[in-house]
Swiss-Prot record:
Domain of life: Eukaryota
Quaternary structure and partners: PSII is composed of 1 copy each of membrane proteins PsbA, PsbB, PsbC, PsbD, PsbE, PsbF, PsbH, PsbI, PsbJ, PsbK, PsbL, PsbM, PsbT, PsbY, PsbZ, Psb30/Ycf12, at least 3 peripheral proteins of the oxygen-evolving complex and a large number of cofactors. It forms dimeric complexes.
Protein name: Photosystem II reaction center protein Z
GO CC, one annotated term: chloroplast thylakoid membrane
Disulfide cysteine pairs (residue numbers): none
């Protein structure tokens, strides 16, 4: 169960990073 929780945490972290990169990239695209 500990591994499953850790895996979910890693997936959530990866999704958060991808969302952040897309958000910054979109803002940068519109500004520039």
């Amino acid at each position: 169960n500990g591994w499953n929780d850790n895996k979910n945490f890693v997936l959530f972290g990866a999704a958060a990073w991808i969302g952040l990169v897309l958000l910054v990239g979109t803002l940068y695209y519109f500004v520039v």
